[in-house]
Amino acid sequence: MFYIPDSYLSSLIQEDLQFMDLTVMALGIENVPAKLSCFPKTDCTLAGVEEAARVLRLAGAEANVLLKSGTDAAGGSVCLQAEGSAGAIHGVYKLAQNIMEYSSAIATRTKALVTSAQAANPNTRVAVTRKNFPGTKALSLKAALAGGAGIHRLGLSDSILVFDQHRVMTDDFLTQIAQMKKDFPEKQIAAEAENAAEGLAYIAAGVDSLQCERVSPAELAQFVKEAKGINPQVTVLAAGGINSDNAAAYATAGADVLVTSWVYFGKPQDIKMSFSRG
C-alpha cells in the first residue's frame, strides 16, 4: 500500500472548488445525471488512476478503476469510469484529469528509462530523487514506482548522504566515516565524490555507497572497476543528467543504481475525459 490521505486529496479539491462551480450553477445542471469515461489518447504507462477515482468519490460520484496504475495501456483504453450528478463530476474532473496526466507522464518516462537501463544491464536499478516539485511528493513517487523505479531518498530523515556542501563544514570527513558507522549501525553511509580519487578514498575509508555526479560512462566504467577492487560490496550510483537516452550507457558501464530527477519534468500525458448524460 502507498498511503495518500484523503485530507491531501481534499486540499487539492479545495484549491479549485472553493465553494461551488458557478458555471454549473448558472446553467442549472447540478443534479443532471452524468457519466464520465477517461482514457489516454496514446500508449502510456498509467499512474494516478486510483487517486483520480478517490477525488471523484470525495465529490460524491461513483468511480470504477478499470486499469490500475502501472498498466501499460494502449491509446483509447478506458482506465476510469464515473457516474453521478453533473455537479459532482464537473466539480472535480479537471483535478482528476491533471492527476492522471502528470502522474502517467512520470510513470511513462520512468518506464522508458528503466527498460533501457535493464536491457543493457539487468542488475542496474533506477531510483528517483527527492527533487520533485514541492507539494507533489506523494503523487510523484507513486507514479515513479508505477513506472518501475525505486526511491533514492524520501527526504532528509531516512538516509545519510554526504555531499561536498556537508564536507566543507567538517574538519576531516575521512576520519568521521568510521565514527558515523558506529553511531548509526543500521544506516548505510553514502557520499558523493567530486572526483575519482576522492571517491576511492571514501570507499577505502568505509562508505557503503558512492555517488558519482556527472561523469561520462567511460569514466564511470573505470571507476566501478577500481571501486569494486577495493570493496566488491560497495554500491556505485550514477547521478546527474541521467535520462532514457543515456541510461543504457551508464548501465553498461556498471552502475548499480541510476539516480534521476529527469522523470519528474516533461510534457503531461494526454488523458481524454469523455462526458455523457446518465
Q: Model segments located where?
A:
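Acidic/glycine-rich phosphate/pyrophosphate-binding loops and surrounding catalytic core
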Residues: F2-E194, E198-A205, S209, A221, ...
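Short secondary-structure boundary segments
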Residues: R214, G240, S261-W262
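Ligand-binding grooves and catalytic loops that recognize ribose/phosphate and carbohydrate rings
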Residues: I242, A248-V257, S276-G278
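Catalytic-pocket segment enriched in acidic/His residues
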Residues: S216, A227-K228, N243, A249-A251
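Short, structured secondary-structure boundary patches
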Residues: E213, N231-V236, G278
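Short, charged, intrinsically disordered terminal tails
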Residues: W262-G278
